[in-house]
Amino acid sequence: FEGLDVNEFYPMKSSELKTPISKTLDSIEESFCYLMVGQWCNGNFGEDRKDTAMLVKVFLETFKNKKKKPGLILKTSGASFSVLDREDILKKINKIKQSVSGDLPNIYLLHGDFYDDEINELYNHPKVKAHVNITHGEGFGRPLLESSLSGKPIITSAWSGHMDFLNSNNSILISGNLVDV
């Protein structure tokens, strides 16, 4: 059984944000950011379960050369929270950036283990306008449930475990096709 403590994840006012993560987010130049929270799983481009690489590419392609660009905040890691893992994630992001030409929007990496109060402040920070995740498959989708308690929009795939609590009334659901693997 998955669930979460509504005393840990809940809507917050800007004046209630107190952890160092809020100061980090305050330093981001964009006032409109999308947020993705989840592990960057193993697999080549388009093969990782969370489809993080595809999300990065779609974000870059969608907002390149726009006069006013949003930011993308990735709260992610690979298999660990080590310095090597962080460098590996940055290499993956930079490789995708090199494949997209133009004036690209900014991507911000938050790497490491966060406490629940820090994650809740991340979901509730005023620069975070929507949670986005184009996952191929979730057992449950805990970050999607956590972020849903902030009351902000969620943009995600219209399939998998998170459909137990997300629907077209509380989310923007992206349709797709199942493929044999």
Give a label for each model feature.
Residues 11-118:
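Conserved catalytic-core segment of nucleotide-activated headgroup transferases in glycan assembly
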Residues 141-144, 159:
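Short glycine/serine-rich donor-binding loops of glycosyltransferases
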Residues 1-10:
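Short beta-strand->alpha-helix junction loop in the catalytic core
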Residues 121-139, 149-153:
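Acidic donor-binding loop of glycosyltransferase active sites
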Residues 46, 134-141, 163-164, 180:
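Nucleotide-sugar-dependent
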Residues 118-121, 162:
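Acidic, amphipathic alpha-helical patches
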Residues 153-156, 172-173:
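Short hydrophobic beta-strand element within catalytic cores of glycosyltransferases
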